[in-house]
C-alpha cells in the first residue's frame, strides 16, 4: 500500500477554506494536472539563461528524447503533461498544489533533477534584471517545522547556481512566531504526517522567494499547527504575531501562503494592526478555489494592508492566462485595499476586491521544488513540481524586497500607482469552475474572467520588470 495514502486521508477529513468560508470534503483538493520545466521559456535545456544571482548553472540532464526529466520539460512546454498527470492540495489551509504521478493519484511526481521552472526561467518571463544585488530580508511564515529546511534550500540554490544562503552566514534565520527558537519537529503520529506535508509548502515558499531575489536574506518563521473548527482565531492570532516578529527582525517583505476564515476577531483589533506596517510589504495567497462567491475573502488576503496575490498559467509559448483555480472575490468588511482605485472596488460594490497582482500559480506551469523531509512516510519527494497561489505570493514578496522601494508601501498602494508598462496585462482565462459571477447580484464579471485592465484572477497583471516594486 502507498504510505502516502494514509496521510492524504487526513486531508480529506479536515476542513479547508473555500472562498473565505469553510467547506468539507474535496472542494479544496484540486484534481488538476501539472508539470513544468526548468528551461521551458528558453528551450529544452535545463537552464539556458545566466543565473540571476551569479554563479554557474548546472544542467540536470542532456537534451534527449529518452531522458524522463527532459521529456517532462518538453511536455510542459507543449502543455501536454496535463493529459497524463494530476495535482492535489499539499496541506489543509495552505494554497500549494503538487503534481502527482498520474491523474487520480496522491503520489507526488518525483524527478531526478529540476523539471519545473527555475529562477532564470521566471526572470525571463517577468523581464527582470540579470543581476540581483539586494540583501533585504524576505520573511516566510509557515506552519509546523521542517528539519531538512536548510539542507533542502542549499540543494535548490546549488542546482540553479544561486549564492549560498545558510544559517552560518546569517543569510538564513529560523525563528518561531514569538521570536524564539523553532520547536522540535514531530517525530511520529498525525503531527509528523502533517509536518511532512507542510514541508512541501515551506520548501516552495523558500524556493520561490530565492528565485525572485537570489541575493536576499531569508527569515523562516514557524507557527504552531492548528486546524480545528475552534482554532481559527488561535491560528490567525499566531500568524499575526509572526508578522510582528518578522518586522521586528528587520524584514522588508513578509509572505503568507495560508488562508483562514475571515471574522470579526481577525479583521479588527490586534490582528488587523499586526498586519499593517508601513514600509513593509506583506503578501498573501488568494487561494486555489476560484471565485469565492461570497462576501468574504480568505484571511489575510482580504485585509486592506496586504497585497493579495492571484495566479496565472505561464506557458513557454503563447500569452499567460488567468489560472482557472486562482482565488478572487470581495471583502465587504472593508471599503478598499490601501490605494485601490474606485474603478477596481466597483467590481465588489466598492469594497475590497482581490486579487491585486499575480504571478505563475498553475501547477501545469509550476515551480521546481526540492524537499526531502519525510518523518512519517520515509519516502522523500526530492525534486518535484508545485504550483498554487502559494507559489505566487512568496515570489511577489521577493520582488518587493529585491526592488527595495518600500518606504511608501502600505498594502498594494504602490502597485496601483505604477504605470501600466510595469505589468503584463493578462487578458484571458476564467475561474468559474466552482462558482459563477452571474449567480451573485452586484458582482461584476471581471471578478471571474480575465480581461483588459484589472480582473479578479490576476489583479493588475503580472510583473514586467521591477518598476512597480
What are these regions (language model features)?
Residues 315-321:
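Short acidic, Gly/Pro-enriched loop/turn segments at secondary-structure junctions
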Residues 50-285, 289-311, 333-387, 393, ...:
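Substrate-binding/charge-relay-adjacent region of secreted/lumenal peptidase catalytic domains
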Residues 323-324, 454:
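Signature tryptophan residues that serve as conserved aromatic anchors
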Residues 397, 404-453:
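An often Trp-containing, charged/polar helix-loop segment at the C-terminal end
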Residues 329:
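Phosphate-binding P-loop/Walker A region and its immediate neighborhood
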Residues 2-50:
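Secretory targeting and sorting signals
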Amino acid at each position: 500500500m502507498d504510505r502516502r495514502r494514509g496521510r492524504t486521508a487526513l486531508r480529506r477529513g479536515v476542513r479547508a477554506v473555500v472562498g473565505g468560508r469553510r467547506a468539507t470534503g474535496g472542494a479544496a483538493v484540486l484534481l488538476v494536472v501539472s508539470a513544468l520545466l526548468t528551461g521551458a521559456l528558453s528551450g529544452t535545456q535545463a537552464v539556458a539563461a545566466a543565473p540571476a544571482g551569479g554563479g554557474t548553472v548546472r544542467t540536470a540532464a542532456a537534451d534527449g528524447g529518452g531522458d524522463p526529466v527532459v521529456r517532462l520539460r518538453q511536455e510542459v512546454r507543449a502543455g501536454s503533461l496535463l493529459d497524463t498527470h494530476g495535482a492535489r492540495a499539499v496541506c489543509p489551509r495552505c494554497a500549494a498544489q503538487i503534481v502527482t504521478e498520474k491523474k487520480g493519484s496522491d503520489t507526488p511526481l518525483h524527478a531526478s533533477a529540476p523539471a519545473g521552472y527555475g529562477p532564470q526561467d521566471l526572470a525571463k518571463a517577468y523581464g527582470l534584471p540579470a543581476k540581483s544585488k539586494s540583501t533585504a530580508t524576505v520573511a516566510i511564515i509557515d506552519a509546523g517545522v521542517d528539519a531538512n529546511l536548510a539542507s533542502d534550500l542549499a540543494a535548490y540554490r546549488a542546482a540553479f547556481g544561486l549564492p549560498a544562503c545558510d544559517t552560518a552566514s546569517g543569510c538564513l534565520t529560523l525563528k518561531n512566531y514569538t521570536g524564539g527558537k523553532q520547536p522540535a519537529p514531530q517525530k511520529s503520529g498525525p503531527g509528523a504526517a502533517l509536518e511532512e506535508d507542510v514541508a512541501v509548502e515551506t520548501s516552495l515558499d523558500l524556493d520561490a522567494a530565492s528565485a525572485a531575489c537570489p541575493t536576499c536574506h531569508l527569515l523562516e518563521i514557524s507557527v504552531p499547527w492548528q486546524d480545528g473548527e475552534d482554532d481559527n482565531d488561535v491560528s490567525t492570532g499566531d500568524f499575526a504575531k509572526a508578522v510582528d516578529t518578522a518586522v521586528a527582525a528587520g524584514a522588508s517583505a513578509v509572505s503568507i501562503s495560508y488562508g483562514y476564515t475571515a471574522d470579526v476577531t481577525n479583521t479588527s483589533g490586534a490582528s488587523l494592526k499586526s498586519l499593517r506596517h508601513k514600509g513593509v510589504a506583506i503578501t498573501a495567497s488568494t487561494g486555489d478555489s476560484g471565485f469565492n462567491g461570497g462576501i468574504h475573502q480568505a484571511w489575510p488576503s482580504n485585509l486592506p494592508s496586504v497585497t493579495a496575490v492571484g495566479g496565472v498559467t505561464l506557458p513557454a509559448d503563447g500569452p499567460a492566462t488567468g489560472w482557472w483555480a486562482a482565488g478572487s472575490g470581495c471583502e465587504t468588511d472593508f471599503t478598499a485595499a490601501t490605494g485601490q482605485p474606485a474603478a477596481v472596488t466597483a467590481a465588489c460594490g466598492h469594497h475590497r476586491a482581490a486579487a491585486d497582482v499575480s504571478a505563475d500559480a498553475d501547477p501545469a506551469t509550476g515551480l521546481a521544488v526540492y524537499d526531502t523531509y519525510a518523518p512519517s512516510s520515509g519516502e522523500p519527494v526530492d525534486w518535484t513540481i508545485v504550483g498554487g497561489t502559494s507559489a505566487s505570493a512568496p515570489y511577489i514578496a521577493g520582488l518587493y524586497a529585491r526592488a527595495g522601494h518600500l518606504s511608501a508601501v502600505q498594502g498594494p498602494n504602490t502597485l496601483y500607482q505604477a504605470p501600466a508598462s510595469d505589468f503584463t496585462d493578462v487578458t484571458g482565462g476564467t475561474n468559474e469552475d466552482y462558482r459563477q459571477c452571474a449567480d451573485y447580484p452586484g458582482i461584476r464579471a471581471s471578478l471571474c474572467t480575465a480581461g483588459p485592465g484589472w480582473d479578479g484572477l490576476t489583479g493588475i497583471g503580472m510583473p514586467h520588470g521591477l518598476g512597480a516594486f
